[in-house]
């Protein structure tokens, strides 16, 4: 990575702080407000400079489409086990304290890639691939997903587990149960945040 200017380093630090505190990156408007820029366009120019220097990667058409290569917030501690996330409060980060029901004594390294938390599954939309109501879904925190992967996604204030498919700016979140219709998202009109990938299932 090329050397950053003091202002670029400040922006990168703010992005990391947002990822750690909230679980997702800031918007251009939030960066502009935090750094005292007159408009989000100024933030956009700084982000493009950071991307050219290899400090971040940007997803076109997504207001929070900022990724820091190699940076994964909220890594679980092997000794502490994994937090079990119950119902996610509207708008709250997945790992917010009020969402954590308990801790499960299982080594995160048991999963590949390693798990960062367990999410309690609600409903039967993924039953055809063996993910059932009440199961604990092991999740690896990442903001990137490839077509066909099972993801934990946030749309607005709702969090859902579905299979990911993307073509250009269109994303489909596909259920593994014919009773559930696909969820279609146009990234130009609506924000979608990948919270993580499914890396395993625990049934108690």
Curated annotation (Swiss-Prot):
In chain numbering, the residues marked as site (Cleavage) are 90-91
Classification via InterPro entries = LexA, LexA-like, LexA/Signal_pep-like_sf, LexA_DNA-bd_dom, LexA_repressor, Peptidase_S24_LexA, Peptidase_S24_S26A/B/C, WH-like_DNA-bd_sf
| E.C. no | 3.4.21.88
Which CDD domains does UniProt cross-reference here? S24_LexA-like (cd06529)
Disulfide connectivity? none
Q: Which UniProt keywords apply?
A: Autocatalytic cleavage, DNA damage, DNA repair, DNA replication, DNA-binding, Hydrolase, Repressor, SOS response, Transcription, Transcription regulation
List the molecular function annotations (GO) for this entry: DNA-binding transcription repressor activity; sequence-specific DNA binding; serine-type endopeptidase activity
GO CC field: protein-DNA complex
Q: What biological-process terms (Gene Ontology) are attached? A: DNA repair; DNA replication; negative regulation of DNA-templated transcription; proteolysis; regulation of DNA-templated transcription; SOS response
Is Transmembrane helix there in the keyword field? Answer: no
Q: Which reaction does it catalyse?
A: Hydrolysis of Ala-|-Gly bond in repressor LexA
Which Pfam families does the annotation name? LexA_DNA_bind, Peptidase_S24
* Residue numbers annotated as active site: 125 (for autocatalytic cleavage activity), 162 (for autocatalytic cleavage activity)
Per the database entry, where does the chain bind DNA? 28-48
What does the function comment of this entry state? Represses a number of genes involved in the response to DNA damage (SOS response), including recA and lexA. In the presence of single-stranded DNA, RecA interacts with LexA causing an autocatalytic cleavage which disrupts the DNA-binding part of LexA, leading to derepression of the SOS regulon and eventually DNA repair.
How does it associate, per the subunit comment? Homodimer.
* Entry similarity comment: Belongs to the peptidase S24 family.
Q: What is this protein called?
A: LexA repressor
Task: Give the source species.
Answer: Pseudomonas aeruginosa (strain ATCC 15692 / DSM 22644 / CIP 104116 / JCM 14847 / LMG 12228 / 1C / PRS 101 / PAO1)
Q: What is the lineage of its organism?
A: Bacteria, Pseudomonadati, Pseudomonadota, Gammaproteobacteria, Pseudomonadales
Q: Which gene encodes it?
A: lexA
